[in-house]
Amino acid sequence: MKFIKYLLILFLILKINYFVESGVDCQKNTEYFVENSCGKNPSKLNINTDIYYFESIGITPYSPPVYNESTTNYFWYLKDGIEYTFSYRYKGCQNIKSHSIVSQGMYYQLLSQPLCPNTYFNYTIYNSGEFGGNTNYYSTPQNIISSNYNGSCTINILITPLSNSKGAFQSSAAKYTYPTCGFNNGTISVDLTKGYSNCHLFSQFDTSFLYEIEPSSPCFYSGLESNYYYLFVDSKECATERLSIQLFNVFTPLEITFENVPDYNQNSIVSLSLSSGDNGILNKTNSFATVGGTGPDPLSTWSHKETKITSTTQFGYFYNKDFSTDPLKVICSFNDGFEPQKFNPNFNFTVTKSDTCLENVTITFYPLPSQTFVVHDYILGNILPLTNNVLSVQYNKFLHISEISSNSERYYSTAFYAPIYRVVETSNGIGCWKTYNITIGEYQIYSNLTMKVYDGDEYEYIFYPIEGVFVNVPANYFYIHYKVKDCEVESIIMIDKYEEITPMDDVKMDISIYELGNCTHETSILVNIDTVFGNFSKVYSSFSNGYFSFYLPNCSCNIGFYYSIPPLIDSETFSYGFISDLDCNSTGTVIQLLGSNGNTIQEVYSNGIKLIVNNDVDTDFAYNIGPGENNVTIKYSNTKGTCYKSQMINIQSPYEVPLVEVTPVIDCDSSDGKISISNYMNFYSLDIIIDSSTIPINSGLVSNLPTGTYTIVYGNSGSCANSIDVYVPSSEQYVEITTSVISHPTCGEQSLNGDGKVNVTLKVLGIKKNTFYIQNQNQISSLTFSDGGVYIAAAPGLNTLSISYGGCIWNRDVNTTISKPTFSFEKIYNDTCLSSVYYKLINNNTNIAINSITSPYTLYSYQNEYYTQMATNLIYPYTVTWNTYCTETFYQEFTFDTPFNYYSNYIQYEIVKADNCNSFKIDIIIKNMNTFQKVTLSSKYPTPINSTHAIFKNLPPSISYDISFTLFDGCSGTEMVGYQQLSNGNTKETIDIIKVNDICNSGKGSIQLSNMDTSNHYYYVKTFSDYYVYTSYPIQPTTNDNGTIISLLSNLPVGSYNITRNCKSITNCYIETKVVIENKDPIIESISVTDSYDKLNNGTAEIKLNYNSTYPINFKIIGTQLSNQNGIFSNLPPKTYEVQVTLTDRMCPITISQSFTINFKTSPTPPPLPQDPSDELSTSSFIQLNILSLLLISIFTIFIL
């Protein structure tokens, strides 16, 4: 019992001593204050006491504490409008102190989240008045910016609806029509059958909603003028909606007829007229037409105005709102524009050629008055001179013809007698492993016939034909070079058989060192590749690792590979020389490294210690070395930094230095560290620098030193002084230091500050110390923390903590691991019309307190919550700062998708082409007008046809039209219409074309044009050229025997041809027809037979082909010995035969066969012979002879019997 009593007394004494020593008053409230926010940032709860004096401290609802580097105290972020409980317990105390905290920052509250995009809702801004009052507001969902009474605080909040697909607009219940200027006939209506009621309409300028506009009938408003309106309407699914409606003035469509538009820089004749809309109120007496500008400049007549049409030309009309002719009245003015940038002006020239290459090609241009033609040699780039619009140019030129005023162009080739060719794939390979035979027709007439290809390294390879056939050439661009007839200049045509993909299944590769390099010479790599084309090898040179490309010769195959260069070896040898005074005993011996050989010294080490360049010496590569033996390692590289090596040399420094012995600090309070120098007698002078003061060292001993690094200055004469640094450590014998990781860092690198927390406990001579200093020696900008024994900026990895108490310093290594936080923006709302998608930053890391977020793009913040809105696909960068010391930039890809798609085909339409170019007009009929609030084309509104159809009439010529529209839900877009329909022309006319395909790749295809109107039109043929551009040339018409104008394009090889007819008087009035000349194999066109008479075997057969080859054709009847080269067979007995026809033509080496039958034909009965005496005698004698023979045969038979 006494023992327990003594223990209890001892416990009370120790407890009393603890509280006396710590000085903690368990009943005292800690000092704190609330820093109220100003809208954007959250409020803060600040404390004036170090957090580590508490056993526990925090707020509920939970928020992590944040370190304030400027005050060295902690704070907590508070969300305004929330009541927090602030609780804490001092160390050594049992009682928990609690306080209720409510910040008074400016914030907002919703009664409920709005239901639909236009729901009219109420929200309250708190603490926005001069004395903390609150203000109620009404709005529709949007990003709301609101300021307090004096504008010193601004709040930025994002209100999103629960649904973006519901509402009066979204369901097409709310509709409106635009008023015609001056008529006040606009309407706004709501379909009450769709669940809507209680409509109220106000002008948007009536901000207090005092003057309601009365409806004509429930929820139908008529007689409205151009204005901005608010329509309020109730429904169950959206509560009260406030619809914002803007009614624009529309105009009676202006119809423009272009009677003559030869070129948009020349005068053209146009006629203008109004449609029959608006009940015929507008007419030519109370409205005035204008051409050529935007201002009122009335014409004397509405038609036949000559003007130059340019990109700024305006056609329009105006009238007074009261339809009077008083010029001082307020007017309605409409203008429509013309878009010549979409047109090509007429471009006419003719070409005259001869059959000899010795004469030039003549090209004659026929420009309009404003046109100027310039011709360039496409290959050489130089301008070719024109004389009176006539160009005389050699054959074998590729011309670029441009027209200056319109910035339009054509290409034309004068290649002479381009060969006909046939391409046949000869392999089953894929990708670039394909091979081809290219057969040149009539190759005998060409000289210097070669084919050139270029590999990826731009080396030229030449193939030569075998009897006009380039055999098994690999996939690539083939350039056929040739001379023909009397041409001295080489012509070139190109055949595109390039294949980009290189399959690697059958490729074997061997890479080896061909020649090992060094720091001045690259290493050479020998690459051997075994492919379907054979074995290839190539040498590459490089200093460093890299990705290489092996382009196989001749073909388009490209084999990539990566190779690592082995460490390069250099034979560099370094020497050194002493620079410092040899008579001055010193550790500051300076050496100069010699023999750099153009290499760059990276680092120099002596006995494992990195040497610093001596900048006080006027020479390169000078370093200080220590006394005695120095094993110096030199690390160097070549000038490109691709070759690294190290070399070691031994340098002996002859100088003597102080021999030092150090006694560590044991008593931290008295700092009893010592430095003793045993050879102090050998120096002329010997001093120590303490706190910037130089103190002589007497008898070689310095005492009462705290832990630290000291500089010993010594010299052997009065003119020479040098120094060494000596570190006095603290004794580890009487200290206990324990470290533990409170929390691992969430950011940082080893040399930078992190946010990890490390607890340090220090006992000296068995006594726990509560106040000491901690630094991290591994960090560049080291922080010092003196309270609580906690280091709060630990970085990932090794943290060498320097713990200072009194005159002692100890180092402890603490390893931490990083636990990086993750942040992400999550989509919270898609608005209806693709204008924005809203995202909110999600922070799921409970140990993270965000200090701030920045981004180069839109970013909203409210109460430490962050939002952004996007209207496109992009990689979104944002920089987050958290837990005071952490900053990192994150990237998130935003993929933009919303219900509305600008590029969908919303408009259903029909293009009505012009009848012809003499009465040119194009109409566009909109077939689903009931799905749009508004449809316009160049500010023009269509003329209604009925409830679903409307028409844009008499449109100017174009290759397409951009129609703008607004849907009932408010979404707007622009759609290009007509491109496909007008790509083959913009009139209803056609060109009569008769096509004859090529046979046997002979280049004998043809295109015949008839019903040609050369008085009003130009005709062109356009085909793909050898230089990836279209070659155009005019078609020359002829007149046939019937007086009809026709044109026959003959001797056409296989290919695509665009036949274009351009109008002479109307710009861009054209017809274009694509004609494809295909290759067809010859066929047996006919077999003519003559049947055979009985037993005479006199049948005949004649076989004819639809192709006359210049090469022999072999005809053979299978199963017989009959064969020839003309296809005519005779003396054929009746039966069925099969003829086989073999063509030896190189352009189509084929065999075809067909059966035919020689039928049996009975001989006809001979006619009666004439009855003259000689005939009778002969007949009688013949009969008598027969009777006698018969009698003899009978007698002989009887005799035998």
Swiss-Prot record:
Its main location: membrane. Keywords: Glycoprotein, Membrane, Signal, Transmembrane, Transmembrane helix. GO terms for cellular component: membrane. Residues 1-22 form the signal peptide. It is a single-pass type I membrane protein. The chain crosses the membrane at residues 1181-1201. It is found in: Membrane. Glycans are attached at residues 68, 122, 150, 185, 283, 348, 360, 437, 448, 518, 535, 554, 585, 631, 759, 815, 830, 844, 946, 1042, 1058, 1098, 1108. Residues 23-1180 are extracellular. The keyword Ligase does not apply. It comes from the Eukaryota. This is Protein dduB.
